[in-house]
Amino acid sequence: MKNTQLLLINDMCGYGKVALSAMLPVLSHMGYRIHNLPTALVSDTLNYPKFYIHDTTEYVRQSLAIWEELGFEFDAISTGFIVTEEETRIISDFCHRRAQKGTKVFVDPIMGDNGKLYAGVPESTIGLMRHLLECADYAVPNYTEACLLTDRPIAEQITPDEGRALVDAVRELGAKSV
């Protein structure tokens, strides 16, 4: 494990123990060699009535280009909250290239909860996340995200069989494990 190189692609939240601020210390303590690529600087979690998101798309583009030029390798990539359509395309293309080389790709398609997309997340994100899932070894959508990705209606309750069918539908998008 000490030589396992993990690239975490997610937002950095100023107020709240989520995303990179939660992942970095835990995975570092576990002995992984952690590298991070912040997709945004976020003032607080999106469930508050007011927040600010600082877009880092250009930073992401430049960093990935430099890292590829320098030959940096990763054993696994984990994606989380991605802010813009352009950033999603850049990260998806990078993950597809790396997956072809054997890098494991973990996708948390963070885009909504409680039956709707998060504030500021456009509908077009759904299609872009579907493309990212095509190269995913592991996908961890919540119920809302799984329904949005598979064009299924969001229900108050589902049966175990409906839950399994939803997982299978996400798997049909390309994710090897859900």
What are these regions (language model features)?
Residues 2-107, 111-119:
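Conserved N-terminal subdomain of the carbohydrate kinase-like
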Residues 120-178:
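Conserved phosphate/ATP/ADP-binding segment of small-molecule kinases
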